Regions:
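Conserved N-terminal segment of class I S-adenosyl-L-methionine
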Residues: 1-107, 113, 130, 163, ...
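Feature marks short, surface-exposed loop/turn motifs that line or immediately flank catalytic pockets
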Residues: 81, 147-150, 191-193
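A short beta-strand submotif of the Rossmann-like class I SAM-dependent methyltransferase core
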Residues: 113-119
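Di-metal (Zn2+ and/or Mg2+/Mn2+) metal-binding site signature of metallo-dependent hydrolases
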Residues: 122
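A short glycine-rich, Lys/Arg-flanked "PGG" loop and its adjoining helix->strand segment in the class I
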Residues: 127-142
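Short, glycine-/aromatic-enriched active-site segment of Class I SAM-dependent methyltransferases
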Residues: 143-166
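Short alpha-helix
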Residues: 165-181, 186-187
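Conserved catalytic loop of SAM-dependent methyltransferase domains
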Residues: 186-220, 241
Length: 257
Protein backbone atom coordinates (compact mmCIF):
# COMPACT_ATOMS: atom_id res chain seq x y z
CA UNK A 1 0.00 0.00 0.00
CA UNK A 2 1.30 3.44 -0.91
CA UNK A 3 2.26 5.58 2.07
CA UNK A 4 -0.03 8.57 2.51
CA UNK A 5 1.38 12.04 3.12
CA UNK A 6 -0.06 15.51 2.72
CA UNK A 7 -0.06 16.71 -0.89
CA UNK A 8 2.66 19.10 -2.06
CA UNK A 9 0.17 21.79 -3.07
CA UNK A 10 -1.22 21.76 0.48
CA UNK A 11 2.27 22.19 1.95
CA UNK A 12 3.00 25.05 -0.46
CA UNK A 13 -0.27 26.78 0.41
CA UNK A 14 0.57 26.78 4.12
CA UNK A 15 4.16 27.84 3.57
CA UNK A 16 2.82 30.91 1.78
CA UNK A 17 0.15 31.44 4.44
CA UNK A 18 2.54 31.68 7.39
CA UNK A 19 4.99 33.81 5.45
CA UNK A 20 2.34 36.39 4.56
CA UNK A 21 -0.40 36.20 7.21
CA UNK A 22 -1.36 39.05 9.54
CA UNK A 23 0.08 38.50 13.05
CA UNK A 24 -2.60 40.65 14.71
CA UNK A 25 -5.40 38.66 13.10
CA UNK A 26 -3.88 35.31 14.09
CA UNK A 27 -3.25 36.48 17.65
CA UNK A 28 -6.86 37.61 17.97
CA UNK A 29 -8.22 34.30 16.73
CA UNK A 30 -5.84 32.33 18.94
CA UNK A 31 -6.97 34.23 22.03
CA UNK A 32 -10.42 32.63 21.85
CA UNK A 33 -9.16 29.21 20.79
CA UNK A 34 -7.03 29.17 23.94
CA UNK A 35 -10.03 30.16 26.06
CA UNK A 36 -11.93 27.19 24.64
CA UNK A 37 -9.03 24.80 25.29
CA UNK A 38 -8.65 25.95 28.88
CA UNK A 39 -12.40 25.78 29.52
CA UNK A 40 -12.91 22.29 28.13
CA UNK A 41 -9.84 21.02 30.05
CA UNK A 42 -10.90 22.39 33.45
CA UNK A 43 -10.21 19.89 36.21
CA UNK A 44 -7.29 18.24 34.39
CA UNK A 45 -3.56 18.90 34.60
CA UNK A 46 -1.05 18.04 31.89
CA UNK A 47 2.68 17.48 31.82
CA UNK A 48 3.43 16.91 28.12
CA UNK A 49 1.29 18.74 25.55
CA UNK A 50 1.67 18.42 21.78
CA UNK A 51 0.02 20.72 19.27
CA UNK A 52 -0.51 19.07 15.89
CA UNK A 53 -0.70 21.60 13.10
CA UNK A 54 0.78 24.24 15.38
CA UNK A 55 0.86 26.92 12.69
CA UNK A 56 3.05 29.81 13.77
CA UNK A 57 2.99 28.78 17.45
CA UNK A 58 0.70 31.49 18.75
CA UNK A 59 -1.60 29.05 20.60
CA UNK A 60 1.32 27.36 22.37
CA UNK A 61 2.71 30.79 23.23
CA UNK A 62 -0.56 31.85 24.88
CA UNK A 63 -0.91 28.52 26.70
CA UNK A 64 2.67 28.83 27.94
CA UNK A 65 1.91 32.32 29.23
CA UNK A 66 -0.89 30.75 31.30
CA UNK A 67 1.29 27.87 32.60
CA UNK A 68 -1.14 25.40 31.07
CA UNK A 69 1.38 22.53 31.03
CA UNK A 70 4.91 21.62 32.09
CA UNK A 71 6.34 21.11 28.62
CA UNK A 72 5.23 21.68 25.05
CA UNK A 73 5.88 20.06 21.68
CA UNK A 74 4.87 21.20 18.20
CA UNK A 75 4.57 19.57 14.79
CA UNK A 76 3.67 21.56 11.70
CA UNK A 77 3.24 20.80 8.01
CA UNK A 78 4.91 23.95 6.69
CA UNK A 79 8.58 24.89 7.00
CA UNK A 80 7.67 28.56 7.38
CA UNK A 81 5.38 27.71 10.30
CA UNK A 82 8.18 25.80 12.02
CA UNK A 83 10.49 28.80 11.67
CA UNK A 84 7.84 31.14 13.10
CA UNK A 85 7.39 28.86 16.12
CA UNK A 86 11.15 28.85 16.75
CA UNK A 87 11.23 32.65 16.56
CA UNK A 88 8.72 32.89 19.43
CA UNK A 89 11.19 31.38 21.94
CA UNK A 90 8.36 29.75 23.88
CA UNK A 91 9.47 28.74 27.40
CA UNK A 92 9.38 24.99 28.11
CA UNK A 93 8.98 24.02 24.45
CA UNK A 94 10.99 20.83 24.02
CA UNK A 95 10.60 20.03 20.32
CA UNK A 96 9.48 21.76 17.13
CA UNK A 97 9.31 19.50 14.09
CA UNK A 98 8.07 19.54 10.52
CA UNK A 99 5.92 16.50 9.74
CA UNK A 100 4.08 14.94 6.82
CA UNK A 101 0.59 15.55 8.15
CA UNK A 102 -0.16 12.01 9.32
CA UNK A 103 2.78 10.35 11.10
CA UNK A 104 3.74 11.70 14.52
CA UNK A 105 7.35 11.19 15.68
CA UNK A 106 6.33 10.12 19.19
CA UNK A 107 5.71 6.86 21.02
CA UNK A 108 2.39 5.34 22.05
CA UNK A 109 0.56 7.33 24.76
CA UNK A 110 3.63 9.56 25.14
CA UNK A 111 1.61 12.79 25.30
CA UNK A 112 -0.81 13.70 28.06
CA UNK A 113 -2.73 15.95 25.68
CA UNK A 114 -2.76 16.61 21.95
CA UNK A 115 -4.30 19.84 20.69
CA UNK A 116 -5.80 19.91 17.20
CA UNK A 117 -7.52 23.24 16.72
CA UNK A 118 -8.89 24.36 13.35
CA UNK A 119 -6.85 21.69 11.58
CA UNK A 120 -9.23 18.81 10.84
CA UNK A 121 -11.22 20.81 8.28
CA UNK A 122 -8.02 21.10 6.22
CA UNK A 123 -6.98 17.42 6.38
CA UNK A 124 -7.26 15.25 3.28
CA UNK A 125 -7.47 11.95 5.20
CA UNK A 126 -9.07 12.88 8.51
CA UNK A 127 -9.58 9.37 9.88
CA UNK A 128 -5.92 8.50 9.37
CA UNK A 129 -4.88 11.51 11.41
CA UNK A 130 -7.39 10.73 14.17
CA UNK A 131 -6.02 7.20 14.52
CA UNK A 132 -2.51 8.60 14.92
CA UNK A 133 -3.71 11.06 17.58
CA UNK A 134 -5.37 8.20 19.43
CA UNK A 135 -2.12 6.23 19.35
CA UNK A 136 0.06 9.02 20.78
CA UNK A 137 -2.26 10.89 23.17
CA UNK A 138 -3.92 10.05 26.44
CA UNK A 139 -6.41 12.86 25.78
CA UNK A 140 -7.17 15.04 22.75
CA UNK A 141 -8.74 18.48 22.32
CA UNK A 142 -10.23 19.13 18.90
CA UNK A 143 -11.84 22.34 17.71
CA UNK A 144 -13.48 22.86 14.32
CA UNK A 145 -15.50 25.66 12.79
CA UNK A 146 -19.17 24.85 12.39
CA UNK A 147 -19.18 25.26 8.62
CA UNK A 148 -22.03 23.05 7.50
CA UNK A 149 -25.20 24.80 6.40
CA UNK A 150 -27.99 23.78 4.04
CA UNK A 151 -26.66 24.30 0.53
CA UNK A 152 -23.02 23.97 1.54
CA UNK A 153 -22.34 22.30 -1.80
CA UNK A 154 -23.18 25.58 -3.55
CA UNK A 155 -20.49 27.42 -1.54
CA UNK A 156 -17.46 25.33 -2.40
CA UNK A 157 -15.49 28.33 -3.65
CA UNK A 158 -16.12 30.14 -0.35
CA UNK A 159 -14.89 27.29 1.85
CA UNK A 160 -11.92 26.38 -0.33
CA UNK A 161 -10.77 30.00 -0.11
CA UNK A 162 -10.15 29.23 3.59
CA UNK A 163 -8.68 25.80 2.84
CA UNK A 164 -11.71 24.00 4.31
CA UNK A 165 -12.03 20.74 2.40
CA UNK A 166 -14.14 19.16 5.18
CA UNK A 167 -17.18 20.73 6.83
CA UNK A 168 -18.64 19.83 10.22
CA UNK A 169 -21.47 20.29 12.63
CA UNK A 170 -21.18 19.28 16.30
CA UNK A 171 -23.18 16.12 15.55
CA UNK A 172 -21.10 15.16 12.52
CA UNK A 173 -17.83 15.62 14.43
CA UNK A 174 -19.16 13.55 17.34
CA UNK A 175 -20.15 10.82 14.89
CA UNK A 176 -16.68 10.87 13.34
CA UNK A 177 -14.98 10.65 16.74
CA UNK A 178 -17.25 7.93 18.10
CA UNK A 179 -16.83 5.78 14.99
CA UNK A 180 -13.05 6.16 15.31
CA UNK A 181 -13.10 4.81 18.86
CA UNK A 182 -13.00 8.00 20.91
CA UNK A 183 -14.95 8.68 24.09
CA UNK A 184 -16.19 12.25 24.41
CA UNK A 185 -15.49 13.67 27.86
CA UNK A 186 -16.62 17.28 27.54
CA UNK A 187 -17.60 19.69 24.79
CA UNK A 188 -18.61 23.28 24.22
CA UNK A 189 -19.81 25.61 21.49
CA UNK A 190 -19.19 29.30 20.99
CA UNK A 191 -19.99 32.10 18.58
CA UNK A 192 -17.54 34.49 16.96
CA UNK A 193 -16.70 37.25 19.45
CA UNK A 194 -17.72 40.78 18.39
CA UNK A 195 -14.11 42.02 18.45
CA UNK A 196 -13.14 39.33 15.94
CA UNK A 197 -16.04 40.20 13.64
CA UNK A 198 -15.21 43.90 13.89
CA UNK A 199 -11.55 43.34 13.07
CA UNK A 200 -12.44 41.23 10.03
CA UNK A 201 -15.15 43.64 8.87
CA UNK A 202 -13.35 46.93 9.34
CA UNK A 203 -9.66 45.99 9.07
CA UNK A 204 -9.60 43.05 6.66
CA UNK A 205 -12.58 43.87 4.45
CA UNK A 206 -12.09 47.62 5.01
CA UNK A 207 -15.81 48.31 5.30
CA UNK A 208 -16.87 51.70 6.72
CA UNK A 209 -16.99 51.74 10.51
CA UNK A 210 -19.83 53.65 12.16
CA UNK A 211 -22.25 53.38 15.06
CA UNK A 212 -24.85 51.41 13.11
CA UNK A 213 -22.43 48.82 11.75
CA UNK A 214 -20.77 48.20 15.13
CA UNK A 215 -24.14 48.09 16.90
CA UNK A 216 -25.44 45.46 14.44
CA UNK A 217 -22.44 43.23 15.15
CA UNK A 218 -22.91 43.51 18.92
CA UNK A 219 -26.67 42.97 18.64
CA UNK A 220 -26.40 39.85 16.49
CA UNK A 221 -23.92 38.31 18.92
CA UNK A 222 -26.16 39.09 21.92
CA UNK A 223 -29.27 37.67 20.24
CA UNK A 224 -27.50 34.39 19.47
CA UNK A 225 -26.19 34.09 23.03
CA UNK A 226 -29.57 34.79 24.63
CA UNK A 227 -31.49 32.51 22.27
CA UNK A 228 -29.06 29.66 22.87
CA UNK A 229 -29.30 30.02 26.65
CA UNK A 230 -33.10 30.09 26.55
CA UNK A 231 -33.82 27.35 24.01
CA UNK A 232 -31.11 24.86 24.93
CA UNK A 233 -28.33 22.78 23.40
CA UNK A 234 -29.94 22.10 20.02
CA UNK A 235 -30.30 25.78 19.17
CA UNK A 236 -26.96 26.57 20.78
CA UNK A 237 -25.27 24.17 18.36
CA UNK A 238 -27.26 25.58 15.44
CA UNK A 239 -26.04 29.13 16.14
CA UNK A 240 -22.47 28.10 17.00
CA UNK A 241 -19.44 29.09 14.97
CA UNK A 242 -17.00 26.85 16.86
CA UNK A 243 -17.23 23.40 18.39
CA UNK A 244 -14.61 22.19 20.88
CA UNK A 245 -14.40 18.67 22.29
CA UNK A 246 -12.17 16.93 24.83
CA UNK A 247 -11.93 13.20 24.20
CA UNK A 248 -9.88 10.08 24.85
CA UNK A 249 -9.51 6.55 23.53
CA UNK A 250 -12.64 4.55 24.32
CA UNK A 251 -12.32 1.28 26.23
CA UNK A 252 -14.31 -0.55 23.56
CA UNK A 253 -13.83 0.16 19.88
CA UNK A 254 -16.97 0.22 17.70
CA UNK A 255 -17.78 -2.77 15.49
CA UNK A 256 -18.51 -2.31 11.80
CA UNK A 257 -21.06 -4.84 10.52
Amino acid sequence: MQEVNSSENLKTAYDNYYENNDETWRMLGAKYKVEHIVEVCKGYTFNKVLEVGAGDGVILKLLSDRNFATEYHAVELSASGVERIKERNIPSIKSIQEFDGYHLPFGDESMDLIILTHVLEHVEHERMLLRELKRVAKMVVIEVPRDYRTGVDTRIKHFLAYGHINVYTPTSLRYLLLTEGFEIIKDLTDTIAPEVTKFYTFKTLKKPKNFVSTFKIDLEHSIKKVAASVFGKKLEEKFANYYTVLCKKAEHQPDIF
